Amino acid sequence: MSGLGIMVLTLLLLVSMATSHQDGGGKQATQRDAINVRRRRSITRREVVTEECEEYCKEQNKTCCGLTNGRPRCVGVCFG
């Protein structure tokens, strides 16, 4: 293979590596944004929790994450 052919293949390889690396950064940013949204939702939802719900879930050694269909939703950890 000629020197020019090797240079072209090397350039294509470098370009593909650079673009895949940029895509990975975009995915990380998207995941980070999704985590931030979940955190905000769980904080907002915690404000709606009533004392009755907290007491009911405390008996089960769980955390009250709000009401679902009028009934307390008790889980180990609240996620948005």
From Swiss-Prot:
Flavoprotein listed as a keyword: no
Highest taxon of the lineage: Eukaryota
UniProt signal peptide: 1-20
Residues the record lists as Phenylalanine amide modifications: F79
Domains: entry comment: The presence of a 'disulfide through disulfide knot' structurally defines this protein as a knottin. The cysteine framework is VI/VII (C-C-CC-C-C).
Disulfide bond annotation, renumbered to this chain: C53-C65, C57-C74, C64-C78
Compartment(s): Secreted
Expression tissues: Expressed by the venom duct.
Gene Ontology terms: cellular component: extracellular region
Keyword field contains Heme: no
Lineage: Eukaryota, Metazoa, Spiralia, Lophotrochozoa, Mollusca
Any one GO molecular-function label of the UniProt entry: toxin activity
Propeptide residue span(s): 21-44
Family: Belongs to the conotoxin O3 superfamily.
Major localisation: secreted
Annotated protein name in UniProt: Conotoxin VnMSGL-0123
Keywords: Amidation, Cleavage on pair of basic residues, Disulfide bond, Knottin, Neurotoxin, Secreted, Signal, Toxin
Pfam hit, one: Conotoxin
